[in-house]
Amino acid sequence: MTPYIGRATGSNILNFGYWSEKTKDPLQAQNELCRLVGEFANLNSAKKVIDVGSGFSAPAIHWKSIYSLLNIICININLLQLKTATKLVSNTPGSDTKTLSNAKEISFVNAAATILPFVDQCVDRVVALESAQHFKSLIRFIRESKRILKRDGLLIIAIPVITTAKSLQQFMKLGILSLTWASERYKLTNIKSMIKSAGFKIIEIQYIGSHIYEPLSDYYIQNRNIIKHIILKGDSSYFRTILYDIIENIFYKSALKMKEVYQKGIIDYVLIKAH
């Protein structure tokens, strides 16, 4: 759903966003989640940060604008996204992002999350902002994170989760959302077990689903016609409009289901901090 709404907002940020009473739109919510994760990760005391599954590196750009001394390395297996991110950071033609005065301290590596190309104990933070659910496999990423983190380093994971042992069966009965949740569906208990088995100690878990699922669903439901107008603007051919209506109806039903499963306590969204 976030890439879909992102097309309407023009955002390069690939996360659900953190919504409050003051939040006006998805872009503001997405930036707020980046800010929240930066604070949760104690980036103010870090020097070298690995952003794994970095997307278009919008979180890295956001963090660098706040924590100017950070050296951020963006890891992404998607080469096309990395090339786009490079343009965004360097402000080459085709990018509308302002050049960062210290952009040279944001770098890019095309690699898998499960084989991180770094020596042992070399980084202060490993951050996976809404990306770890896509890693194959999650435990290998966690073990690699343990290997490259310094002794006082932190692993930070922001991730949507299944909340109870029975939830997976309940989730599979909820129809279309099972199809549009395009990632692994991890139970929180399993994630905690993997983190501990890799030698980490969990310091803190924040449950922020109340600021994620319902407000995002409500925004989409309330603004679906506006979003349609923006996406189809300049190209509203009959065939494209019909195709859009089919796809949009799927996302609309998914938004309703996402709100429903959160209200039933089947899913949540957590921030995990471990060392």
Please place each PLM-identified region on the residue numbering.
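Class I SAM-dependent methyltransferase SAM/SAH-binding core
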Residues: 48-115
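A short acidic, Gly/Pro-enriched loop at the edge of an enzyme's catalytic core
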Residues: 114-126
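Substrate-binding/catalytic lobe of Class I Rossmann-like enzymes that use SAM or dcSAM, i.e.
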Residues: 176-266
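Short, glycine-/aromatic-enriched active-site segment of Class I SAM-dependent methyltransferases
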Residues: 160-182
